[in-house]
């Protein structure tokens, strides 16, 4: 398994060298990759300003129908779109294996693909809810601890988790027909992945791809696990409203709080030395998701383990990111920028390997 990892990383290094030489030879690295030079950037800023003006004026119907052009404008840039799609596909393959999908004709596969598509669409109501809450409740990003937490819990966590869960709801009747907690959780997780995919396009667009490795091991699985747990609770509530209704509300509230605390701990300066709270929230959500996964998966012998699939996906994204950044910034700059990320993300990889159903580590 580790030979596979090193082989993939070696291919990525050679790919980065090739990208660097093509860049040096005048391959036009920044024609389509650099965000600052993207054609139509000014038009996008004008669209955002018009949208904000509509929201300030309370024209919410116009805001709703104008949102897609703004929310999905970065998708037109092919390079960050391709990198974000590649990362999303790697995690989606992991989810399909975790859900024990048996083939192309398996209904579980199509439920999860539908969930991914609904997650992509959830970016639309997310922006709408966020803009509405900010104006309705007077939410503003703040450097102060209490106001900062309030903004990220109510203004970020609530609209994002609410929109993802709302887009999961249309799939519940199909899940009740198929029946199964495992596929319900993994379909909801796919909704989270779809959201993360669209969100990642914007982040990669603005960072020349430097955030790809970090977000592959943080944002992607965080959205996946948050929505997976909330969706599983909602599915159980739909199946047994009296028994699971209150618990579904509790789980949703906890996911919103965990999301908000994680973001606030990263951004709000007042957290200071207590910023570790965000990583604790992340670890607890991931732990609970994989605990459910271990309990729900039926024992089976697989030619490729989930751990191997995870390591392969992580290695492939690292290799692709290295080549991408080498094309953008040059080989040496890619080495300098990504070396620290690889070391810091090794702890995240350890966390996932430890929680896998067929765990490779025990400490």
Feature annotation, model-predicted:
Residues 1-363:
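Hydrophobic alpha-helical segments at protein termini of multi-pass membrane proteins
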